[in-house]
Amino acid sequence: MTTMKRLLGLLLISALFASCSSTSIINSWKDPNSNDNPDKWDKVLVAVQSPSDLKRRVAEDEVAAMSEVLFASYTVFPDKSVVQNEEALRRKIQQGEYDAIMTMRLIDQSKQTSYVPGSYTGGYWGYHSGYWGGYYNPGYYRQDSYYAIETQVFSLEENKLVWSGITSTVNPSKIDRAIREVALMTFRQMQKDGFIHPTR
């Protein structure tokens, strides 16, 4: 089985997972002029941009664990100073013989307050609670946290961006679960866009 196609096994999981997921795709784009074939890639470097080195490592490990063709960038660039040195960065990537780089970064974070209306128990009769003994659950205000993450894929053969997508995650409880949701939804969207294809 070839390279990126090994990721397609995750799509069955994501299809089952999507109904209860707090992550959704906002938009995506595929380069219509690219001639590189992601289905034949053998090595893809995963680079998560984060001010926290610990969060970067946790996130990259979570994504890299999904396929043997994915590799965490911190294992190649443990020192951030190397990433800031373009020449050293290019040399490291060439030595590793990578086909592509997939980057992930937080591009927006916001909070929204909404009102959740109250409800009556007992159906129709609940509205006449004083007489029929129904029960009223009062409404309340709820604050939700939204995180938008941008994922970009760069072809090293063509030296350009070939796919990008943005996801929105609501009220993530744990970083590893959130990044797993983002990755699954992202791979699923790649298939929808025709960027990667099912094994024939």
Regions found by a protein language model. Give the residues of each.
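Sec-dependent signal peptide recognition
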Residues: 5-10
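Short, Lys/Arg-enriched N-terminal segments with co-localized hydrophobic residues
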Residues: 1-3
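N-terminal segment of the mature soluble domain
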Residues: 42-111
